[in-house]
Amino acid sequence: MNSPDIALIKTYLLTLQDNICAALAQADGHAEFTEECWVREEGGGGRSRVLVNGAVFEQAGVNFSHVSGAMLPASATAHRPELAGRSFQALGVSLVIHPLNPYLPTSHANVRFFIAEKPGEDAVWWFGGGFDLTPYYGFEEDAIHWHQVAHSLCQPFGEQIYPRYKKWCDDYFYIKHRQEARGIGGLFFDDLNSPDFMTCFNFTQAVGDGFLAAYMPIVARRKALGWGDRERQFQLYRRGRYVEFNLVWDRGTLFGLQTGGRTESILMSLPPLVRWEYNYQPEADSAEAALYRDFLPVKDWLAIKGETH
């Protein structure tokens, strides 16, 4: 089967949104998700869910969208000029979780499908997605676990998949104007349409389903750790990097805004509180300095597992 089944993809994505929201709400134990269904004037719509002011999660947004249009925006055709003049559909689930506790990392995941069509020509389609982790205070155990889950879900699809998509993630979530990584990476893939539709769909499902397996054990391990104002101030400062990346470099944000997407849903990825400080430098040998020294530089976390276990 190589003709895309959009109904199948949509059913999976809606179920994925349900499952992730249920797991996050259960882990929080205090706040619930509120849901807003919206319609896009140019075609399509979505289902946005957000949890705010929880006991564990300061803000967690989990979006489903299925938008369509008669013509692609500049952000989509810049690196694919052959798509100009085609109608399109884009489906996806995208989420960003900003915990309250600074010892809990921010996490992001996204799985999406895109198809561009023109009468008399073959449809052009692909899958994309991934997940990545942004700690404020790093724990080697968590980083290894995150990458172990990523590696394991990739294995059935080939030995080369994890290293390829890990590198793509490291390269993509790099804040060029800061010359530093946004976090410790994970997986990132795009333009996936080979060898056939079902293989690509199965891999995309593995990534989507892998997110909870990667993130929830970290939540369970760290959510009860005590923290104070020092940790909170550092978390708010580092959240600034998240804002900078999303507004300056992220293709998904630009695509959403250029296609007339729902601004509130697109910018739900931004943290509710953030701060900047001119020329901040962490204290030498501090826990804050360790983030820059031990976690943000790109490394092979699974090789570390082999050395320490």
Curated annotation (Swiss-Prot):
Keywords per UniProt: Cytoplasm, Heme biosynthesis, Metal-binding, Oxidoreductase, Porphyrin biosynthesis
Protein's pathway: Porphyrin-containing compound metabolism; protoporphyrin-IX biosynthesis; protoporphyrinogen-IX from coproporphyrinogen-III (O2 route): step 1/1
Active site location: 108
Gene name linked to the record: hemF
Species in which this protein is naturally found: Yersinia pestis
Primary subcellular site in the record, as a coarse category: cytoplasm
Disulfide bridge positions per record: none
Transport listed as a keyword: no
Gene Ontology molecular functions: coproporphyrinogen oxidase activity; metal ion binding; protein homodimerization activity
Protein name listed in UniProt: Oxygen-dependent coproporphyrinogen-III oxidase
Enzyme Commission (EC) number: 1.3.3.3
Family label: Belongs to the aerobic coproporphyrinogen-III oxidase family.
GO CC, one annotated term: cytoplasm
Residues reported in the UniProt entry to bind substrate: 94, 110-112, 260-262
GO terms of biological process kind: protoporphyrinogen IX biosynthetic process
Cellular localization per UniProt: Cytoplasm
Stretch list, region Important for dimerization: 242-277
Cytoplasm as UniProt keyword: yes
Assembly: Homodimer.
Cross-referenced PANTHER family: COPROPORPHYRINOGEN III OXIDASE, MITOCHONDRIAL, OXYGEN-DEPENDENT COPROPORPHYRINOGEN-III OXIDASE, MITOCHONDRIAL
SUPFAM superfamilies linked to this entry: Coproporphyrinogen III oxidase (SSF102886)
Function of the protein: Involved in the heme biosynthesis. Catalyzes the aerobic oxidative decarboxylation of propionate groups of rings A and B of coproporphyrinogen-III to yield the vinyl groups in protoporphyrinogen-IX.
Domain of life: Bacteria
